[in-house]
Amino acid sequence: MASPTWLGRPSSVAQRVLERMDALLSETDDQGRPVAYNRVAGVVVTGNEDGAHHVISEISGALADIGFTIPGQAWTYWHLGPGPGPDYLDERKGRDWAHSTGRTMADNLLGVARALSERPLQAAG
C-alpha cells in the first residue's frame, strides 16, 4: 500500500482504503481463515515532510489487524524533511536510499510470501 505523508499522517485516500478493507475482517475462506491470511503486505511512503515512520506504522498496523503478514523492513520511503520541497521526479537526493530499501522490501515480501505458500497459516482452533 502506498501513501503520501499529509500533516504527518497517511492521506485521506489511504485511510479510506483501510476503512473499506476493514470489511475483510468478517470474510473467511472455505477453511475458515480470514481472507487476508497467507498474504503479505508492505508500505511505500512519499512526501516532503517528516512523519514517514509514523505513516508506515499506522498503515502496517492496520494491515496486520486485517490479517496480512508484514515482514520486517517491508517499507520504503522518500522525503526531504519538514516543509515544502521538490517532487521526487525533480530531485535526485535520497533516491538511492529509497531504491535500496525498496529492493529490500521486495525481497522480504517475496521471501515471506514463498514461506507462507509452502506452509500456510491455519484457521484458529
Model-derived features with residue positions:
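Glycine-rich phosphate/pyrophosphate-binding loop and the adjoining helix
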Residues: 64-125
